[in-house]
Amino acid sequence: MAFTIAVAGKGGVGKTTTAGLLVRYLVENDLTPVLAVDADSNSNLNEVLGLELEATLGDAREEMKKGQSQGMTKDLFIEMRVNQCLVESKGFDLIAMGRPEGAGCYCAANHLLTDCMDKLAANYRYLVVDNEAGMEHISRVTTERVDLLLVISDPSRRSMTAAQRVQELAQDMKILDGPCYLILSMVRGEASPALLDAAKEMGLDLAGVIPDDESLAEWDLAGKPVSQLPADNPVVQAAYAIFDRVVPRE
């Protein structure tokens, strides 16, 4: 099975940017193939990676629930739609979970979807999951446990408290089968002693700091994929230094 890395944190803290840079890091270090999974209902990992997204697994789930399986058995229909949702690229592929569930029971669709995702993930060396702050969607992606959890936070107390909750939730759900690290993002200057002390008090193992960089926002506003930032960009360099320390070479 693939080595599963989940990236989580509340919105607006650089979570998806970090996930995109992680995919790029794995590809550049020949740790391929990689399956990137956008498990955030507000799907935009594709934009960070510079890919067009035409369909999501949420669409397939809705179609199956409404009986729109085109005369196929449900398992064959889900398998077909999963393959249609897969966006292929050099060294990695992307798939998005898409819209959240509507009203009614989705148990059958979710069960088939998880089985199909497990089969798909078996073809990859690494699985990178861009997750929402809540870890509920991880069970839709794989029945395997998470090998590495990276929790992203900005340097605010509120965001770090959310990061602490993510770590506790992962432990309570018993989905974590490896270490959990905190990555502080969008930090101006050096991380203050008070910030480092707060992380320690919350039981968060700090892996490193990614600086705040104006060129990141300018790059994004220009419509350029953040994952294609120049190699000498401070954000890229800081992220890669962290990945060098925490990502095992499977």
Identify the residue ranges that each predicted region occupies:
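Walker A/P-loop phosphate-binding motif and the immediately C-terminal alpha-helix
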Residues: 3-41
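Short, hinge-like loop/turn segments at secondary-structure boundaries
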Residues: 51-55, 169-170, 197-201, 225-227
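C-terminal alpha-helix
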Residues: 238-250
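C-terminal boundary of histidine-terminating zinc-finger modules
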Residues: 222-233
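N-terminal phosphate/diphosphate-binding loop that engages ATP/GTP or pyrophosphate donors
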Residues: 27-90
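Cytosolic-facing regulatory segments adjacent to core modules
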Residues: 78-84, 88-89, 93-129
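Conserved catalytic-core segment of NTP-binding enzymes
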Residues: 111-209, 218
